[in-house]
Amino acid sequence: SDAIIVIKVIPLLAKIKMISIPRDTYTDVPCEKGGKVDKINHSYAFGGRECTIKAVEELLGTKINYSVVFRFDDVITLTDIMGGVDIVANHSFTQDHETFKEGEKYNIKGARALAYTRHRKTDSAFKRDERQRQVMQSIAKKLVSPSGWGYVPGVYSYMQEKMEISF
């Protein structure tokens, strides 16, 4: 896995909280032969979504009730369906011929959204994790706002047909 993000939805407070688990975090990977300690991002290769969920549950000591697997193509397609999402760049960089300047606001979609979420060469994995959470939050924020409700059927349809989801 490129990124593992745990999301907690608190409906009564209308809040969504996210944490990223660094991909190089060593933990028990229960699906690996012999159940050994390995990088958590290897759990997907050993047993897919279910193995990753088990590894995250063991690491955090909490139950994961629902999951979504986002692939690179999903970031491209979902942000395209939604007409882009708004972000404020957390770092200045160029990735895949896409340039971002720290502190500037952008509406990103498609390959530009993917470039923003994948960059880590000139800053850090932590900044990249922050960008990934930022794009996820922007997708959620747009879908729950009245102006974004029109995108919900297209996003839902795409997720049902093309993505690994459990909810």
Predicted regions and their residues:
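Non-catalytic, solvent-exposed segments at the cell envelope interface
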Residues: S1-F167
